[in-house]
Amino acid sequence: MMPVLKRMLLHTVNKPWGKYEDLYRTDEVVLKKITVDPKQRLSLQAHNHRAEFWVVTDGECLCEVGPNVWRLRKWGTIHIERGHAHRLINDTSEPCEITEFQFGLCQEDDITRYEDDYSRAEPPF
């Protein structure tokens, strides 16, 4: 029983755009609560080994996936296939909360950043 409890411990990571909290984590499934601060956005990024599913649980945000941008409000959802460039954008004056489900090979270093407001993007080749 102890290994399951360890996987379910809440872990908070502060980011320049807000924070995320690990709610559940295994090698193949991750459940996160993401809070995007007002007027902030995540990097434009892609993952080679995992897909993601987002549910807006509070506020609203823009979701950019490839060339498309959608406004999602509370309980709005979107699925991001592995390999697709994507990002969350909070263009409002209130925080936006997202529940993120990751599935596949879930590792934090499985990320390619194409654009980033905080100078974390990969240099062009």
Q: Can you name each region flagged by the protein language model?
A:
Residues 9-51:
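A short glycine-rich, His/Asp/Glu-containing loop-to-beta-strand
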Residues 1-3, 17, 36-38, 77-79:
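Extended recognition/assembly regions associated with phosphoester-bond processing machinery
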